[in-house]
Amino acid sequence: MTEYAILCEKASAAKNFASALGGTSGEFEGHSYKIVHSHGHLMAFVDPKEQVPDDKAAQYRSWKLEHLPWQVADFSWEKQPIMAKNPRTGRKKSTKSDLTEIKKNVKDCDALVIATDVDPSGEGELLAWEIINAIKWRKPVKRLYFADEEARSIQAGFRDIKPISSQQSDGDYLKSDARSKWDFLSMQLTRIATTVTKQAGYPVKVVREGRLKSLMVRHVHEQATLVKNYKRKAFYEVKFQDNAKHVFARQFKDDETAAKWRHAVKADAATEMAQYHNSAITNVKTARRHSAPPKLLDLSNLASILAPKGYNAKEVLSTYQKMYEAKIVSYPRTDDSKISMAQFYQLLPLVPAIARVVNVDQSLLTHRKPRFTHVTTGSVDHGANRPGEKVPPTLAGLSKYGKSGPAIYSVVAKNYLAMLGEDYQFDHVTAELADYPSFKTAFNVPVALNYKLIFDSSRQISDVDETQGEAQGQLGQTAAPFIFEGANKKPVRPTMKWLMNYLQHYNIGTGATRVSTLSQITAGTTALMKERRGALSLTDTGTISAILTEGTIISSTNATKRLMTLMDQVGSFKLHPDELLTTATQTVTHDLPIMVKNADKLKASLGEPEKLVKHYPKKAKTGGQTSTGKEVSFNQVWGGHRFTTQEVADLLAGKEVQFQIKTKRGKPMAVHGKLAQQTYRGHKFWGFKPADDVFQRRTKSRRKAR
């Protein structure tokens, strides 16, 4: 008998575990083990109609609003193996075979050890217990915790494998299971949104609503509306300027105070300016100040920095995950904002090599002691995002993990190295006018850039202009009055930086959760948003979603934050999972009538429904009389080939024509055929029809090649 069956989340993790422990099976420090792995989630909830008693199935199948909200007590929460389509072959495959394989491999083991990712959301725990239940495992279950897939971390976790007395005593599982059930129940909101939209006459496929996605969409819509409705209101204000271009102005504590000195008419400002004369500058004070490097970036910050370079959320998420599995960077789904003391000293010897790869001057890396703004003496789960212990030889080679690979490593590495740079030093200068002391100036003069020469993440992730307040040169001797033309502040356009900063400010989700959600709602035919080089805009469906969720719980920032707090309480045994699920029913009950009412606003924002219908360009037609005297019309282009006048005449005469086209892969392909009447979805039409052997011959040649 083998003592431990170690269950990893995916094949890449199993490979790293095998490397750390000495093989896919064997013995490590007196304990025999065998490594098995999943391929992510293998189980999923069955459809709502299959979750409930037979006499209620029709009700739960229906999308009619009269059947909402659902009764949580009706649900069995049954799961089944996932049936997924292979994107390359198009074939569907059930995960049942994976479960069978795992069950066969662990049957002779004494205990099953959960070694899935230690995710802050508890997703790894949920994934593992789904498998444990599916294979009907009845022996002991244990947990191996690890910070990352480095050998040191895996070995430390193996030495400290912890028992789990029962599924219900695993807080991470309870949290993730309750969250997945809440999200399943939120499907009702998608049904509401889709139904009321179709009833209003808009031809949507589905309007997706959900825990974080609805908040994101609504917030982007609100900001885009502010931008759209912005009207510039100029004002004129008297200020002073010296000959070194330093501006002296009154300091206002609020807009009401500022309004007293900001004139709507330029002539009024000129009248005020006539009261002033040139004034000497006095009370000049200079203070030497310094600022430490900004904190380490989370995944949402990283993605928002890379978005303007053309790397979308899905690309960054996918590539970072592959680089983590190769030990190039740290664990992506971390909730930590600092690293541990041990992690700091583990990377310290690698600093010269990391600096060489990203072309950072090593003479700047002189701060070799832990900064307690970045390093904690306490414990961390994974530690903040940072370079891994495997240093790549070159940046260019990282493109094998994804096109954003070099850019990801460059930002992550430089951000980490900035911590080892000295503080930025600058002189903070203040002064005022001798004759008009209420007119003051303040600016910073850089003395030593230090860490800013390595990487300044605060400037990289900011969605506002931070150059204001920095100046060069000495103050002048005197300053003269002038009329400054300003305007009410223009709202910031919605960008990925702006959105991620907002969510981070309210501590909603981990960095990886934010990026993952954005990736989901910007992909596919039912996308709610579009992201182009960091700029965010809504699709028609996204606009519909935003309008429908105005005033709802599902799109509320405070409600979303509260919901995530409740989920954490489930994980720490402070809240029963059933109590969390009642909030899903409360949300649907509250939001349903609001969304129905909001549907009346769609026309005002979107126009008449037909304007949303996608109009495809008309295809070029040709035609004439066939040999039987029938007048026909057919497409002049087939497979990218445009029929010549002679080919059209031959087709009408019933003759066969031959020509070359290119396949989707760009390979040449010979085609021959005739004009024929055909049927597609019950509709009869005339068009070119390739001979039966055209595609048959191609299939045979492919088989031979194989």
What are these regions (language model features)?
Residues 167, 258-295:
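Metal- or metallocofactor-binding catalytic centers and their adjacent structured scaffolds
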Residues 2-5, 24, 88-91, 95, ...:
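Basic, low-complexity terminal or inter-domain segments flanking catalytic cores
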Residues 230-247, 278-319, 325-328:
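C-terminal accessory/connector segments of nucleic-acid motor ATPases
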Residues 1-188, 486-490:
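Intrinsically disordered, low-complexity regulatory segments
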Residues 149-153, 298-300, 319-329, 333, ...:
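Short, conserved phosphate-binding/catalytic loop or strand-edge motifs used
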Residues 201-208, 219-262:
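C-terminal helical "lid" subdomain and adjoining coupling/linker elements of P-loop NTPases
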Residues 48, 108-113, 247-264, 628-634, ...:
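OB-fold/S1-family RNA-binding modules
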